[in-house]
Amino acid sequence: MFDFQHQLKILPDKPGVYIMKNSLGEVIYVGKAKVLKNRVRQYFQNSKNHSEKVRAMVKNIAEFEYIVTDSEMEALILECNLIKKYSPRYNIALKDDKFYPFIKITTNEDFPRVYVTRNFAKDGNRYFGPYTNGTAVYEVMGLIKKLFPLRTCKKAIVEGGEPTRACLNYHINLCKAPCAGYISKAEYWEMIDEIINILNGTDTSIIKKLKLEMEKAAEELEFEKAAKIRDRILAIELISEKQKMFTVKEGDEDFIDLYTDEKDGCAQVFFVREGKVTGREHFMIENISDDPVKEVISSFIASFYGGTAQIPKTIYVPEEIEDQELIEKFLTEKRGSKVWIKVPKKGDKKNLLDMVRNNAKIMLDQFKEKMVEEKELNKSALTELADVLGLDSLPARIEAYDISNIQGVDSVGTMVVFENGKAKNSDYRRFKIKSVKGPNDYESMREILSRRFSHGLEEVNKIKERNLEYSKGKFCIFPDLIMMDGGKGQVNIALEVLKDFGIEIPVCGLVKDHKHRTRGIIFNNEEILIRRGSGLMNLITRVQDEVHRYAITYHRSLRDKRTLHSILEDIPRIGEKRRRNLLMKFGSIDNIKKASMEELLDTPGIDKRAAESIKQYFSS
């Protein structure tokens, strides 16, 4: 049992991060503190001063832990990382949270690749972005591909390496085939340098040079060549124009404001570049009615800019935010020059911030209207389902199960959950089949259902024994209806498992036609046809598609992992860490097999003996 009095007594008077957990060991809140002992103790004192949300959270705290840091800045960075990792229930959650795309140039390779990624890392490569307009980044990439025949493969290609056969892209003029040795590193890098200059938007010499070439071609009556150069100039100018919207310069600004109703809120960001509003983003934030605006905006800024590579010089907000000095310091370190957070009192900037707030209100109203509309449609479908099955109440929580394997190999089971007609991803569960050998879907289904309800009963008993407030654990909430993707056989398996545990839950299955399309439901040994295109059929299709997707995705990930690791596990001197480093560097077994000694030695953790072991294994 966690000793709160003792743990509160020994809290250090240092900066750090505290992690609150519920009775099931789940992280429900992550916070930072300038002085840990002062901040954490506040939660367990003077509850009258706490908001309703904080009081609800404190009731669910079964234990806490903390991590001491050297500074408040380190605590802020760690807090951001842990919130992203755990998505705790009581932290502010951005409903439309997203990682913006970047254009990445792998400049640490001899023959770099250029592609779109949503993962920004300090790995020595060049990143351009983030692009808040997802369409624009792919338009830019499309233009780059037209202009520059670069490689798109993940091969580890080094200058002077063993040449391989050129792929189809070479034969259709989309790649210069560095893999086959048809282009030198210096020639290839001329294209890369040109792309970097275009994306930077700082070098106009390329266009000047091309215009001279175009004029020369026209003078020599090479009109086809001149037309191609003209098209190239237009494409480069178009890229440069699009880049202006996403390149943060010295005078660029972001405007952030928040609108809340009686429960939820919407944070709106306007991006101002060269004095013009070039883009905007909005994020829905749930259950913040009791939270002070300064706290919400502070948390929002830390989360929003924590995942982006570029930060404007000035951020305008409606009022001073919590930990403003610390947040400014955090953003300044990320940007590499001073960042200011300001509150405009009058003039154009105040007017623009008012516009941001008005737009936040509009977006929140639209979001709520859409939610109401979806809620009505889902309620109608659930009402129809309850009527069809003769249930006493609406099946608010539906659990669906599926099995995925290839001839019994890497057999997995998955459970997806729909609450009030909407997918509830946080409650999805997946199972590796342990007791069944070979392709036996019925027994595999029996295993995962037995494990699911066994865990559920254990959790319920634990909560009751400790007299704790009922908490949303991994399995303790039981469904109102179980929907089996299969027919009568799977339904009977589910009913047998429930009977063994003494649980009464209605179970239905899905009936397919000769084209394997769902045509109805089987319930109590009776087949019930469902009208195609009805709200109920649309709901069933959503559930069915989701459980299939989740099962296949999990099965594929296990299969790929097994395939990649099985060969490397047989190589002497190659442990788990080295296997991981090899796969991160080369991407595939085939690339590792083809790698030279120099390439292998360039891999973190691979010494001469390990490299020799790899070469010997693949040559034998």
UniProtKB/Swiss-Prot annotation:
It holds the Pfam family UVR. Its main location: cytoplasm. Residues 204-239 form the UVR domain. GO terms for biological process: nucleotide-excision repair; SOS response. It comes from the Bacteria. Interacts with UvrB in an incision complex. This is UvrABC system protein C. It comes from Clostridium perfringens (strain ATCC 13124 / DSM 756 / JCM 1290 / NCIMB 6125 / NCTC 8237 / Type A). The lineage of its organism: Bacteria, Bacillati, Bacillota, Clostridia, Eubacteriales. The gene is uvrC.
